[in-house]
Amino acid sequence: MGNSKPLPTISCISVFALYFSFYTITLTSSTSLQDDFIKCLYRNTNVRFTLDKTFFTPERNASIFTEVLESTAQNQRYLTKTMPKPGFIFKPVHESHVQASVICSKKLEIHFRVRSGGHDYEGVSYVSQIEKPFVLIDLSKLRQINVDIKDTSAWVEAGATVGELYYRIAEKSKFHGFPAGVYPSLGIGGHITGGAYGSLMRKYGLAADNVLDAKIVDANGKLLDRASMGEDLFWAIRGGSGGSFGIILSWKIKLVPVPETLTVFTVTKTFEQDRSFKILSKWQEIADNLVDELFLRVFFTVSGNKANKTVTMAYIGQFLGEKGTLMEVMKKDFPELGLTQKDCIEMSWIDSIIYNSGFPTNPPPPIEILLQAKSPIGKVYFKGKSDFAKKPIPVLGLEGMFKKLLEEDAALVIWTPYGGKMDKIPESEIPFPHRNGTNFMIQYYRSWSDSEKRPNRRTKWIRELYGYMTPYVSSNPRQAYVNYRDLDLGQNKDNSKSNFIEAKIWGANYFKDNFNRLVRIKSKVDPDNFFRHEQSIPTLPV
């Protein structure tokens, strides 16, 4: 696969006949570029495609173009009128179309972005703020999934969602699962490039820890698999973040065993019920040391009106087993929570996906909702940040955190426990380095609606909360999760040679010492920095 054969050229007559049947050229500089790109695509692929279903421009039909652009973009903050828009959008329907896209973009010197599910926190998969003009390669039509229960594996294309993958696994077996994220609308292509954690992480590690093979298009338009790309590049794409080394076409993943019966629960406590922080402090002490089968997160939200606002803590758990065994574990290790049999709900693994996703639970939607690529929280404007705690946060620190939370109405903080399998995998196994010694990960999240008159006030607040937490989290470097991308940490400037110096700071936040190896691999496989964005891995300075 490493040495792709030259693709046959379609005759000029057939190219232009097909082209003009779907597209009318307007003599402007932008459409001239579109014209050149389309003709180049046809010359470099032998798999036909129709322009009206794959190629979208504001000149042809502005409303359809906008609909396609916004279709999977999850952060509305990057769809405002002032944000740059792609000159056109191309939706490949075959892997050779992706190869041709790379070849033609390189030949015509077109900067592009690649989107699978549109969940990038800072929108870099569909917006370029540093290089304009740009175009968008949207992989949403590449979503085939082939599950092989006998081989305990599956091939899944980059445009498929996590929800679709889970559904197709459950369709074949009730005893198999996969340890990826909890939100069903996540695009599998980009999700795994950042590591990808979920409710099975303490038992089986990350999604990226369970990748067996991959197909990728490199900077020369070649189609590579694990054998032809080599182990260095295969290492880099499993957690080194997307948009740096090539375009992921598909992953071969390892399925993991799950029991026929899982148990889930939610126990909610208000600040008034845990004013001394006895329960929360105990969670900090034991959450990463519980049995590997138990995954117990804490969600902090603000409830009540102005006169009666309080912080609510929802302890949301999943146990790989029946509720009787879970009750024994909780009575032994975390009696302070007060879990009861009534709190526990037994269900299948696929039903637990619906439960953990945040969809309504009374009644829950049918599992077919996983095929609809719907986000349970909808599409909102938001800003997110992340941290890693290496030790329990003292009561004084918790008091200050709660005080900051009460300043807002739509604030969300999530604590995710580590330990288990995460402790057993070395930091350098893949680029994702947050392993042994991590008690829990923290996500800070603030959303708002399009009617918000002062969005800058919301982003200012989350930055203040992040600043307040500084003494209580990791340092030197202050670690961050790359799938919760945060441009506050720093960003590249155009295609500048100075990017490496500045990137060492945010690179250490995301990857610790693994950043240096990522840069060496990037410099080898993409020396011209063809694949780039605001936080892509830079090349070594010449």
Swiss-Prot record:
Annotated S-S bridges: 40-104
Domain of life: Eukaryota
Ranges where the FAD-binding PCMH-type domain occurs: 82-258
Keyword Disulfide bond included in the entry's annotation: yes
GO cellular component terms, semicolon-separated: extracellular region; plant-type cell wall
This enzyme's EC code(s): 1.1.1.-
Gene Ontology terms, MF aspect: FAD binding; oxidoreductase activity
Signal peptide positions on this chain: 1-30
Listed Gene3D superfamilies: 3.30.465.10, 3.40.462.20, Uridine Diphospho-n-acetylenolpyruvylglucosamine Reductase, domain 2
Keywords in alphabetical order: Cell wall, Disulfide bond, FAD, Flavoprotein, Glycoprotein, Nucleotide-binding, Oxidoreductase, Secreted, Signal
InterPro entries named among the record's database cross-references: BBE (IPR012951), FAD-bd_PCMH (IPR016166), FAD-bd_PCMH-like_sf (IPR036318), FAD-bd_PCMH_sub1 (IPR016167), FAD-bd_PCMH_sub2 (IPR016169), Oxid_FAD_bind_N (IPR006094)
Coiled coil, from the record: none
Pros-8alpha-FAD histidine modification, residue list: 119
Keyword Protein biosynthesis (UniProt): no
Cofactor names: FAD
Glycan-modified residues: 61, 308, 436
Cellular compartment(s): Secreted, Cell wall
Family classification: Belongs to the oxygen-dependent FAD-linked oxidoreductase family.
Protein name: Berberine bridge enzyme-like 25
